[in-house]
C-alpha cells in the first residue's frame, strides 16, 4: 500500500508542478509586487490555477506521509525522481508548454527509470 500512496504523491506533485508553472508564466512577476497581488485578488483563472497547484502540493504531502508509514525511506525517496520524468514528458505532450526533446534529457530519463527498476526489483533470498 505504501507504493500506491507514493505513486499518488508523485502524480499529484507532478500535476501541481505543472499548475504552478502555468500560473508563473501567466501571472505578473513577483518583482512587480502590486501587479502580482492585484492579479491574485482578482482571482482569475491564473490565480485559481496557482491555488490549485499549492493545494495539490499539500495533498501530495499527505500522500507522502502515508507512504513513509508503509514503505522504506530508501525506496520511497527514489519514487520522487519519477516526478521529473512525468513533468518532462507532460511539457512536451501538453499544448502550450513548448517542452523540448533532447537526447541528453532522454538519457537522463533512462537513467532515472533504470535506477528505479534496480531499486524496486524483487530480491531473491539465497539459501545456504
Swiss-Prot record:
InterPro entries on file: Flippase_ArnF, Small_drug/metabolite_transptr
Give TM regions.
Answer: 3-23, 36-56, 77-97, 101-121
GO cellular component: a single term: plasma membrane
GO biological process terms, semicolon-separated = lipid A biosynthetic process; lipopolysaccharide biosynthetic process
- Involved pathway(s): Bacterial outer membrane biogenesis; lipopolysaccharide biosynthesis
What is a GO molecular function of this protein? carbohydrate derivative transmembrane transporter activity
Q: Which residues lie on this side of the membrane: Periplasmic?
A: 24-35, 98-100
Write down the superkingdom of origin. Answer: Bacteria
What topology does it adopt in the membrane? Answer: Multi-pass membrane protein
Location comes to:
Cell inner membrane
Sorted alphabetically, the keyword list is: Cell inner membrane, Cell membrane, Lipid A biosynthesis, Lipid biosynthesis, Lipid metabolism, Lipopolysaccharide biosynthesis, Membrane, Transmembrane, Transmembrane helix, Transport
Q: Residues on the Cytoplasmic side? A: 1-2, 57-76, 122-128
The family assignment reads: Belongs to the ArnF family.
Summarize the subunit comment: Heterodimer of ArnE and ArnF.
Instruction: Give the protein's function.
Output: Translocates 4-amino-4-deoxy-L-arabinose-phosphoundecaprenol (alpha-L-Ara4N-phosphoundecaprenol) from the cytoplasmic to the periplasmic side of the inner membrane.
Q: What is this protein called?
A: Probable 4-amino-4-deoxy-L-arabinose-phosphoundecaprenol flippase subunit ArnF
The gene name reads: arnF
Amino acid at each position: 500500500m505504501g507504493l500506491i500512496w507514493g505513486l499518488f504523491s508523485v502524480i499529484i506533485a507532478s500535476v501541481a508542478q505543472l499548475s504552478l508553472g502555468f500560473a508563473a508564466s501567466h501571472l505578473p512577476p513577483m518583482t512587480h509586487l502590486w501587479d502580482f497581488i492585484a492579479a491574485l485578488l482578482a482571482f482569475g483563472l491564473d490565480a485559481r490555477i496557482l491555488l490549485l497547484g499549492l493545494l495539490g502540493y499539500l495533498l501530495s504531502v499527505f500522500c507522502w506521509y502515508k507512504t513513509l508509514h508503509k514503505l522504506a525511506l530508501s525506496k520511497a525517496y527514489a519514487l520522487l525522481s519519477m516526478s521529473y520524468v512525468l513533468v518532462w514528458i507532460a511539457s512536451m505532450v501538453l499544448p502550450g508548454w513548448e517542452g523540448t526533446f533532447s537526447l541528453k534529457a532522454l538519457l537522463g530519463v533512462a537513467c532515472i527509470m533504470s535506477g528505479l527498476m534496480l531499486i524496486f526489483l524483487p530480491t531473491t533470498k539465497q539459501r545456504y
